[in-house]
Amino acid sequence: VTTSIDWAKSSDSMVLLDLPSSLTSIANQRDHYLRQSVSMNMLVNNFLISIAREGFQSLNPFINNGFIKKPELNLEYQQYGPSVTYFARANYSNFDINKNHYLLLDNKTAKQIGKRFFTEIGAETLQDFRYFDLSINGSFLYKKYDLDDIKINSKSTTIPSVEIKISSLFSQSSEDSFSLFMPEFVYQKTTYKDQSADPIFDLHQRNFGNFNRLNTKYFFGKDRVPDTEFLLARLKLQKRINNSSRLNFQIIKKNELQESRVINSMLNQSIEKDSQIGTNVSFESEILRAYFAANYSQKRNTLNFGQTGIEIQLPETRLILSRKFQTNVPLLNSKNKLDYVEFSLERSMSEGYKFIGGISKDLDSKKNLESYFGFGFENCCLAFKIYASDKRLSKYNLLNFHSLQFNNASWDKMISIENKSRINFEFELKGLTGGNNNKRNRFFEPLMK
């Protein structure tokens, strides 16, 4: 039996709005939450049982705290066989409103509370042939809502899904190198079921850059299961050279066989099925790391996602330069783009001191998104840094459209207050946090990413 407590609470909902956030999350950097959860887990043979209470405190007074799960019960069972594996999962959650006294909710929204029951039953078979492996995974998803508002009737929903995968692995070795080739073919289909009448409790979009990238999991949460049908071919190459350098190459081709009616219903518009090609290339050595990744829509003739960068690690200097581009960011809306370049520098000086600096610039609006420079110090027991920073925040968030609509003037005022230069001081007592020589650079990682 294991117990986990992850609980934080602030007396002032605006106290942590100045926390720095990753530039790659710029579309959602308005959101800061404190997790408040207690859970207990028990593993007995092939059964896993867990019970939890989970909630969040929003550190933005105009964004809802969301719902509290009190409780959430999970049951999982898995039975392994010689060629077939059976699995079953069940989840029961009782949702209540975690009220934010700054934000007014209409009565209709306030009544959308109740219970959700979700189960998944399926099996997977794996056959090992001479030159390839065949995997077939089939499952049925069942969900049912019991809402406190008796005027709202929610039907139970059963959603079948199947995935067929053919994969192989080839290797080649020589005196100074070792290579792996991994081809893979995938067919996946999830049947469409109308879920528009179901409430949304803990649904959150995965920020992969757009809804139709080379992934199958579109959402966190269980309130919407997108219908999908596609064919995917993937080729991976991994090569190690002289035990000091690594080369990774991947190319993916994906053809969607139908559009997703569930996602189109959520966006209230029609996004047609697509045909895409993507690639990912990276090279790493002792002093150099370079990478390139892109995803291109052939039918729309649009670059959905792209990033390239180089990182140079010298004995006393670390230099990073990158360019990132993506369109159709789900956290903003269905049609938009982010295009920015990042530069950062870390220079070690004598006796543990360091100079740190960096800038991120939006190439579309020709404006600086974030910049910083300063000094830091780190030894075996203490680390601190003092630096000046300037950041321009974004207020747009599709998931909280109503909070923008009814508090637009307050949002603009808050943005104007936060979008100013500041002096930051941070310190860490490494003896209390388990620091050691292997974690020497961890203190500076958030600024360098």
Language-model segments: residues:
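Outer-membrane beta-barrel translocator/pore domains, especially the C-terminal barrels
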Residues: L73-K449
